[in-house]
């Protein structure tokens, strides 16, 4: 099952932007993130081709369609109806979309593959490039440790000052 682009609602999404909480196709990703300096900094991860359906944790036969947060299990429709009776009806369950994501550090040349998929999806339409024929895809490695940037006035938490509280008291 492919996820449709949240912006145009017609093409298959190839990236997910966490800041916008949106899955976007190549064309909409370029429109949203390339034309705006602030939006271009948004962290986006590639959406992989849908994976095979995981099997139900109970019967291990049928494809799982639900995930129960409380039980921590993936369930098919039949097992979900059997397991979640009585008081268990209140368990929060989620639909499994079978949509994998590709983190930049998982595969070599991930940005290149994303660019190729984007080119195939556009099939001949003009695309922005960085001047030497390569498409500019600034992907961030989510597996790397974040770098802490100290700006003037950003060290209030370190000094024990609660910036959200009007009664700033030094912690002992």
Curated annotation (Swiss-Prot):
Which residues participate in Zn(2+) 2 binding? Answer: 56, 59, 79, 84
Alphabetized, the UniProt keywords read: Metal-binding, Nucleus, Repeat, Repressor, Transcription, Transcription regulation, Zinc, Zinc-finger
Instruction: Cite the InterPro entries for this sequence.
Output: B-box_zinc_finger, CONSTANS-like_Bbox1, Znf_B-box
Q: Name one GO cellular component term.
A: nucleus
Q: Where is the composition biased (Polar residues)?
A: 120-132
Location comes to: Nucleus
Q: Does the keyword Repeat apply?
A: yes
Q: Where is this region: Disordered?
A: 119-172
**Segments forming B box-type zinc fingers:** 5-47, 56-96
Role played: Acts as a negative regulator of seedling photomorphogenesis. Acts as a negative regulator of blue light-mediated inhibition of hypocotyl elongation through increase of bioactive gibberellin levels. Acts as a repressor of thermotolerance by modulating expression of a set of heat shock-responsive genes.
Disulfide bond annotation, renumbered to this chain: none
- GO molecular function terms listed in the Swiss-Prot or TrEMBL record: DNA-binding transcription factor activity; transcription cis-regulatory region binding; zinc ion binding
Instruction: Give binding positions for Zn(2+) 1.
Output: 5, 8, 28, 33
Briefly describe its induction.
Answer: By blue light and heat shock (at protein level).
The family database entries (CDD domains) matched by this protein are listed as:
Bbox1_BBX-like
Q: Highest taxon of the source?
A: Eukaryota
Q: In which tissues is it expressed?
A: Expressed in vasculature of leaves and petioles.
Would I find Lipid biosynthesis among this entry's keywords?
no
Instruction: Spell out the Basic and acidic residues composition-biased ranges.
Output: 148-158
Its principal location? Answer: nucleus
Q: Pfam families attached here?
A: zf-B_box (PF00643)
Gene3D superfamilies found in the cross-reference section: Classic Zinc Finger (3.30.160.60)
**A single BP term in Gene Ontology:** cellular heat acclimation
Name recorded for this polypeptide? B-box zinc finger protein 18
């Amino acid at each position: 099952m492919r996820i449709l682009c949240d912006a145009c609602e017609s093409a298959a999404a190839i990236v997910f932007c966490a800041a916008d909480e949106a899955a976007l196709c190549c064309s909409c990703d370029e429109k949203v993130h390339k034309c705006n300096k602030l939006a271009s900094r948004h962290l986006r991860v590639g959406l992989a081709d849908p994976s095979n359906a995981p099997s139900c944790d109970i019967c291990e036969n049928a494809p799982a369609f639900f995930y129960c947060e409380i039980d921590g299990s993936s369930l098919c429709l039949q097992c979900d109806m059997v397991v979640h009776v009585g008081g268990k009806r209140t368990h929060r369950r989620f639909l499994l979309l079978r949509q994998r994501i590709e983190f930049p550090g998982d595969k070599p040349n991930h940005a290149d593959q994303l660019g190729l998929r984007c080119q195939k999806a556009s099939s001949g339409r003009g695309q922005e490039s960085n001047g030497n024929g390569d498409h500019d895809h600034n992907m961030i490695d989510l597996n790397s440790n974040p770098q802490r940037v100290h700006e003037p006035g950003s060290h209030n938490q370190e000094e024990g000052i609660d910036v959200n509280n009007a009664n700033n008291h030094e912690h002992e």
